[in-house]
């Protein structure tokens, strides 16, 4: 309030300096604004109900962020006389209305009222957000409505425009669903590849048997006897009775179908359950990986076609009534030769083969059925080609990769980056912990390798030193032997020709005792040289 007064005061003091205060309601739109926390909780789907702080009856004035921008633009263009303006849309929504709307359209569909004080424990909510969410104020922007020319984005308010607001939110934050369908013959690696892609993209891995089991379990829960509380309204009881009757009728039809088809469920029920699964909120938010279904052209057509024949989507210049809400964005066609697939199944451990369709008879029958279905012009891949969703063909047999790492890498390259919020705080902490452990293990391995290398080098150095010393001693010994061998003739010569005359000369020198013994000895040797004689 003090800031608003100061701004208005500056405008009154200086005529050339016009100032305005625009009192805006809670802003929504684009990335979600102050309602982003509720959008995120709903989109992630990790809680059974969105929280409503307090009783939720407080009225919150709101305005779309683009409409607020339009109001400000009009203030700049027209410089109106009032310097204090109210900018809100025409809605009168409570906190409960807003949260319930978010939960219904992109979340679990339920809300839970919690104490008002718990709002302060929500770490993603700032004090400014809480002030806007907990306010109870009715406002009407009469001047803006009567005097400004605004192209309203959400004039009627948040609830009435939730579809466009949700679209903005998902596009702004890059949260568009990733929808993938993986098809191929048995044992080609569909499930293992789908499982890895589901982990990487944080998608829902959809397998036919799980969908059927989940749907039947849900129907059985509906028809199971319940204790009805005294406070139930009559209308709610009637609706519940109708749901029970419909569920029981559907269960009876399923039972009859399985009895008539040797335990196999008729396509009409499979398509119904699969379509309900693909239209569920988690699949609409994050996306899905459809594993091995549909198998035929007719199944694909029944699953992905629009239920209302009048609603048709134009696809690149042609009309085709497929349901854009559930149609896959990427279709992966895995394949391999029959010999490769048979060899892969033969090499599977017995514990994996037991109780599955990988037993020899069942596998060969399933492989033969797949080949028979996919030799005609109307295959499941032809359906996707017709709506210009061209499959990504991968020959697993040529990759020579038992773990399918190369196929997964190729698919990730085709599909692109994940479209989600990324890692949660817990996942980041886990990733950091794993990275730290890997770093420590790597450093320890490098240190051990370095020590081992140093020890090996030292051992080699000592061995080389010992070898060198050994060879040096050998060389010295050989040199001594050579010198000794070479000195024998010289010694013989000395003993024969030199030493007798030298001894006589020394004896004579001792007898005579000349003044210069050396000259005397030299003269004696010269005179008495045997060779000279």
Swiss-Prot record:
Record-listed ATP binding positions: 187-192, 397
Keyword Kinase attributed: yes
Chain intervals for the UniProt region annotation (NMP): 207-265
Pfam families in the cross-refs: ADK, Dpy-30
Record keywords, A-Z: ATP-binding, Cell projection, Cilium, Cilium biogenesis/degradation, Coiled coil, Cytoplasm, Flagellum, Kinase, Nucleotide-binding, Transferase
E.C. numbers: 2.7.4.3, 2.7.4.6
Region annotation (LID) ranges: 347-357
UniProt GO cellular component terms: cytosol; motile cilium
Compartment list: Cytoplasm, Cytosol; Cell projection, Cilium, Flagellum
Domain of life assignment: Eukaryota
GO molecular function: (d)CMP kinase activity; adenylate kinase activity; ATP binding; nucleoside diphosphate kinase activity
Record has Membrane as a keyword: no
Positions that bind AMP: 242-265, 292-295, 299, 365
Region (DPY-30): 489-533
GO terms classed as biological process: cell projection organization
Chain positions covered by the region annotation Adenylate kinase: 177-426
Role of this protein: Nucleoside monophosphate (NMP) kinase that catalyzes the reversible transfer of the terminal phosphate group between nucleoside triphosphates and monophosphates. Has highest activity toward AMP, and weaker activity toward dAMP, CMP and dCMP. Also displays broad nucleoside diphosphate kinase activity. Involved in maintaining ciliary structure and function.
Protein name: Adenylate kinase 7
Organism: Macaca fascicularis
Lineage: Eukaryota, Metazoa, Chordata, Craniata, Vertebrata
Gene this protein is translated from: AK7
């Amino acid at each position: 309030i003090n800031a608003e007064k100061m701004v208005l005061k500056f405008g009154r003091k200086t005529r050339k300096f016009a100032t305005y205060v625009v009192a805006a309601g809670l802003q929504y739109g684009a990335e979600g604004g102050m309602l982003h926390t509720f959008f995120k909780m709903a989109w992630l789907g990790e809680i059974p109900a969105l929280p409503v702080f307090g009783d939720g009856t407080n009225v919150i004035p709101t305005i779309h962020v683009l409409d607020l921008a339009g109001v400000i633009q009009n203030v700049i263009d027209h410089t109106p006389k009032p310097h204090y303006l109210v900018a809100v849309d025409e809605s009168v929504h409570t906190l409960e209305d807003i949260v319930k709307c978010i939960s219904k359209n992109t979340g679990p569909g339920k809300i839970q009222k919690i104490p008002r004080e718990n709002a302060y424990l929500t770490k993603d909510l700032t004090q400014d957000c809480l002030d806007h969410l907990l306010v109870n104020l009715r406002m009407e922007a009469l001047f803006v409505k009567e005097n400004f020319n605004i192209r309203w984005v959400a004039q009627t308010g948040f609830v009435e425009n939730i579809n466009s607001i949700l679209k903005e939110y998902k596009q702004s934050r890059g949260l568009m669903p990733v929808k993938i369908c993986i098809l191929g013959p048995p044992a080609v690696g569909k499930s293992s590849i789908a499982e890895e892609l589901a982990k990487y993209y944080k998608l829902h891995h959809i397998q036919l048997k799980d969908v059927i089991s989940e749907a039947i379990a849900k129907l059985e829960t509906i028809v199971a006897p319940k204790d009805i509380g005294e406070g139930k309204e009559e209308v709610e009881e009637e609706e519940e009775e109708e749901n029970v009757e419909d569920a029981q009728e559907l269960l009876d039809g399923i039972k009859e179908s399985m009895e008539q088809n040797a335990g196999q469920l008729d396509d009409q029920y499979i398509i119904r359950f699969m379509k309900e699964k693909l239209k569920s909120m988690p699949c609409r938010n994050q996306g899905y990986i459809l594993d091995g279904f549909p198998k035929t052209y007719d199944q694909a057509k029944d699953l992905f076609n629009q239920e209302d024949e009048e609603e048709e989507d134009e696809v690149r210049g042609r009309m085709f009534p497929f349901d854009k809400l559930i149609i896959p964005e990427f279709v992966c066609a895995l394949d391999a030769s029959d010999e490769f697939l048979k060899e892969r199944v033969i090499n599977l451990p017995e514990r994996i083969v037991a109780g599955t369709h990988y037993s020899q008879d069942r596998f060969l029958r399933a492989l033969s059925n797949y080949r028979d279905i996919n030799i005609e012009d109307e295959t499941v891949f032809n359906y996707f080609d017709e709506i210009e969703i061209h499959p990504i063909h991968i020959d697993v047999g040529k990759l020579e990769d038992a773990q399918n790492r190369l196929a997964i890498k190729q698919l990730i390259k085709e599909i692109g980056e994940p479209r989600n919020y990324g890692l949660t705080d817990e996942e980041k902490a886990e990733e950091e912990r794993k990275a730290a452990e890997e770093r420590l293990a790597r450093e320890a391995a490098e240190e051990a390798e370095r020590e081992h290398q140093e020890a090996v080098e030292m051992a080699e150095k000592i061995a080389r030193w010992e070898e060198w010393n050994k060879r040096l001693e050998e060389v010295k010994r050989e040199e001594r032997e050579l010198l000794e061998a070479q000195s024998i003739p010289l010694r013989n010569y000395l003993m024969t020709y030199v030493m007798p005359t030298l001894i006589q000369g020394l004896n004579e020198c001792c007898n005579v005792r000349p003044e210069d013994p050396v000259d005397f000895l030299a003269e004696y040797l010269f005179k008495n040289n045997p060779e000279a004689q």
